[in-house]
């Protein structure tokens, strides 16, 4: 079986499976992005999370949903309010931790070149911890990730260790991260649409590719500092650089793993 046929087989099998996530469906903020990728011949998504704020209890088992020895006392993909956290904390028997987990997306790609397009758009959109994995069987996976998470302990052995004022402060930080996370998702989706439209036009009209390459070389000589994608504004760049300084300069990384 050739690679293209094998990829189509993998895609059909993956998209026909039931959603086994806790929620059981794709998060609202990434539905359009996921559908857009799955409609393309060269991609399909294997998992996603739009980002969430959650309160975990790592301690005595309670009646909440269990996962990896933790109780999920609260989880939301929207902005969170203090009253909900205070009520949820009353159920904690062990060590309760407030977390914000940013957007994550895993996409299997038909070829490495396809993954590189997504990777470039992810990096330019602020997801600077993104990477590509190539398996021994030829499976090429892209993980879209960032590092602007949050994890703060609130209680120990069921005893609250912080004030309500501090919880309110933490939620303001978490909510700001959630709002920035949503902006990055929208930026990634918009950049991806433009990039794939350009790729389609280039494939349909090979002469455009030659012309664009010549124009790019000419512009690069005139303005060597202008290297970022057109869809990212200067203001957005500064905002992202301030938030993810540790991730600047990440390039495509390929890890040989077996699937």
From Swiss-Prot:
It holds the Pfam family TYW3. GO terms for molecular function: tRNA methyltransferase activity. The modification Phosphoserine is found at residue 25. InterPro entries: tRNA_yW-synthesising, tRNA_yW-synthesising-like_sf. Keywords: Methyltransferase, Phosphoprotein, S-adenosyl-L-methionine, Transferase, tRNA processing. It comes from the Eukaryota. Disulfide bonds: none annotated. Its EC number is 2.1.1.282. It catalyses: 4-demethyl-7-[(3S)-3-amino-3-carboxypropyl]wyosine(37) in tRNA(Phe) + S-adenosyl-L-methionine = 7-[(3S)-3-amino-3-carboxypropyl]wyosine(37) in tRNA(Phe) + S-adenosyl-L-homocysteine + H(+). PANTHER family: TRNA WYBUTOSINE-SYNTHESIZING PROTEIN 3. Belongs to the TYW3 family. Probable S-adenosyl-L-methionine-dependent methyltransferase that acts as a component of the wybutosine biosynthesis pathway. Wybutosine is a hyper modified guanosine with a tricyclic base found at the 3'-position adjacent to the anticodon of eukaryotic phenylalanine tRNA. This is tRNA wybutosine-synthesizing protein 3 homolog.
